[in-house]
């Protein structure tokens, strides 16, 4: 889950870090950068959350609540080259909809995390790119929808252009069509395995003696157990000026990355719809539309959270550690993705069940995808968190 962790940077890490980042004058989400205001916040396991396996699969709201369909072909052809529908089913035999009353066979009427939904999400994301400009802790984000060439500033901190802010502008462009499409075949397979492993850990329903093994239970939960849309609310940061919570709405963990907290829902809503209010007003849409749910996970994976690189950059071989990174033990590899997602809680300490879970999923998925990572820097026990 994206967890909240709160650090000092007007928006730093973050929630169980359920995964996204907090953006308040400067917070990223899950941990992202702690730069809530900056981008998002991104720690995922602050508070161990349980997800609800019994909720029915409602239909998504119509109209503006759902991202529009891209006008040009997306990037899923590349992802399809790496994983077939049959392999997807092999990876996730006990995904959401698998019920004990039915011998843990997925109920077709409740099947949510489908192969087709993932491919649709990849296509939708491929139509979007952003330019992130930072001046110190403050940022400006410009979004472009490629099929229409429509460009819009979706976030600009008040002090980004302040007369006193003499910081040099640091500019990054993120093209979401690059998801699992950069590098050699082996590099791309490893990135796909790493992405699926991390979202599997966030949504796992497995245990050591579970049918099929503990690492066959990724994507089992759709949202946290104990929450429903009518009575229980949580993960509301009431005093958040940029992304104020809507009355009676709950921002608990939902989707593959377990998106949590109103500031995270607001940020992903800005990105997808150029309007923060769509998901602030309708956070439940994340569990009504499986493609949207996968989009939240891809967004988190692809978006850098300064001073952190994106998980994509790490696995695609695009991240070059600074001398400070080297001094603090941070190296490219799967372990660095754990550090990005939830380093403050899982890294720079004795290896633990959470990091072992992520690695277990990663190794299994590499095998199913017919590849390996022989020189893997898979652990983060000697890596200091990004800060």
Question: What residue ranges belong to the model's regions?
Answer:
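Surface-exposed helix-capping loop/turn segments at secondary-structure junctions
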Residues: 128-130, 306-314, 371-374
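Peptidoglycan-targeting cell-wall enzymes and recognition modules
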Residues: 70-303, 330-333, 337-340
């Amino acid at each position: 889950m994206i967890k909240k962790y709160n650090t000092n940077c007007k928006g730093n890490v973050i929630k169980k870090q359920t995964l996204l980042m907090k953006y308040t004058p400067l917070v990223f989400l899950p941990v992202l950068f702690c730069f809530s205001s900056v981008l998002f916040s991104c720690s995922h396991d602050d508070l161990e959350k349980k997800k609800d396996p019994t909720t029915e699969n409602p239909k998504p709201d119509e109209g503006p609540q759902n991202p529009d369909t891209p006008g040009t072909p997306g990037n899923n052809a590349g992802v399809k080259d790496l994983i077939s529908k049959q392999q997807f089913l092999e990876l996730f035999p006990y995904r959401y909809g698998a019920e004990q009353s039915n011998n843990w066979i997925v109920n077709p009427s409740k099947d949510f995390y489908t192969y087709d939904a993932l491919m649709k999400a990849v296509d939708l994301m491929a139509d979007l790119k952003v330019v992130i400009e930072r001046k110190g802790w403050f940022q400006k984000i410009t979004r472009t929808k490629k099929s229409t060439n429509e460009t819009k500033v979706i976030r600009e901190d008040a002090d980004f252009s302040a007369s006193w802010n003499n910081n040099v502008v640091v500019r990054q462009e993120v093209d979401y069509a690059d998801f699992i499409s950069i590098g050699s075949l082996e590099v791309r397979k490893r990135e796909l395995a790493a992405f699926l492993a991390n979202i599997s850990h966030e949504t796992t329903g497995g245990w050591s003696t579970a049918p099929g093994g503990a690492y066959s239970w990724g994507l089992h939960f759709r949202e946290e157990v104990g929450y429903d849309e009518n009575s229980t609310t949580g993960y509301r940061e009431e005093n958040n000026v940029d992304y104020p919570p809507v009355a009676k709405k709950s921002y608990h963990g939902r989707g593959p990355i377990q998106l949590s907290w109103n500031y995270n829902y607001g940020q992903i809503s800005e990105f997808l719809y150029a309007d923060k209010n769509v998901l602030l007003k309708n956070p439940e849409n994340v569990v009504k539309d499986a493609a949207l749910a996968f989009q939240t996970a891809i967004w988190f994976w692809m978006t850098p959270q300064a001073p952190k690189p994106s998980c994509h950059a790490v696995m695609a071989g695009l991240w070059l550690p600074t001398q400070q990174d080297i001094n603090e033990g941070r190296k490219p590899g799967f372990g660095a993705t754990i550090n990005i997602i939830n380093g403050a809680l899982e890294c720079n300490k004795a290896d633990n069940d959470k990091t072992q879970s992520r690695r277990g999923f990663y190794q299994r998925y590499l095998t199913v995808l017919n590849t390996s990572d022989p020189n893997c820097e898979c652990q983060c026990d000697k890596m200091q968190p990004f800060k």
